[in-house]
Amino acid sequence: MAIKYSALNLVPIREGEDEQTAINDMVNLAQHLDELSYERYWIAEHHNAPNLVSSATALLIQHTLEHTKHIRVGSGGIMLPNHAPLIVAEQFGTMATLFPNRVDLGLGRAPGTDMMTASALRRDQHDGVYKFPEEVSLLQQYFGPAHQQAYVRAYPAVGKNVPLYILGSSTDSAHLAARKGLPYVFAGHFAPQQMKEAIEIYKTLFEPSDVLDEPYVIVCLNTIVAENDDEAQYLASSTAQVMVSITRGRMQPVQPPTHELQNILTPREYAMAMERQKISLIGSENTVQQKIQDFMETYGEVNEIMAISYIYDKDMQLDSYRRFKNVINQINEKTLYNVINKLSESMYP
């Protein structure tokens, strides 16, 4: 099975820069990935986060679509408790009208922010998480053919069949994705604890649908591929600082890399950062290739790896995504070679 490669962007602000620069960087990265033939480029949704510019996800997706040619662009994801499904369908149906066969709709059941901000987003609606399965079904209806519609229709979404993806960081979403026969995307970049169990549940309980005949798993992982392991670890110190700033409640911009990470962080924070790296793809091309193979042995095969990186140096970030493509292509070539060899052995024993 060939692995596809894609990317997620939270549109972070780098230290010393502003929101406009972060959005420009988002577009520049999208154009780079478009040229590299990445499968898809997703943009997250976060609110009341001073270091991220991903609060108006649909607008950023449209802006990215306007500045790219081929790559699929979507949400990673739209946090459905924050939005009326009708509005989501209208927005994504409009984008699918403007950019046919290029729009994805990844859906999450968490608010993507703190509870006070979530309350401000949905005002008197406090049960959005529990309505998630019902609202996913409603979106499927809105994007479906005319004969499936009710009185309220999400024009121009009708008949657009925008692909839906169920996002998750726990086993709850795995059950829903399996039951509905939809692709499943696990947030291994920030909540890997239940990843193995969730993927197993999804694959075991999967029910074929009009969308998929068999399970389709995407895992999102922190990914930094550099010329050598030491350089990759150095670049990854920015990621560690981002993660620690979240736990401290400070939400700092992306910091420059440092060789003094152990001195900047507390022993507990440093241990946490090193533990997180165990489930990250950080290293040279050879190292990352081996890490992906180890990942498959532990978690089972996945269809697609969605890379996310907090690399301060923009050129190094672009280079990392180029190297990541090389890694996936090398793995796919080896897989194809092995398949051909097995076929040859069976035909000519």
Question: For each predicted feature, which ranges?
Answer:
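N-terminal beta1-alpha1-beta2 module of alpha/beta enzyme domains
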Residues: 1-68, 344-348
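Acidic (Asp/Glu)-rich catalytic clusters
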Residues: 34, 61-69, 96-103, 178-179, ...
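An alpha-helical appendage that flanks or caps ligand/catalytic pockets
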Residues: 125-153, 194-301, 332-349
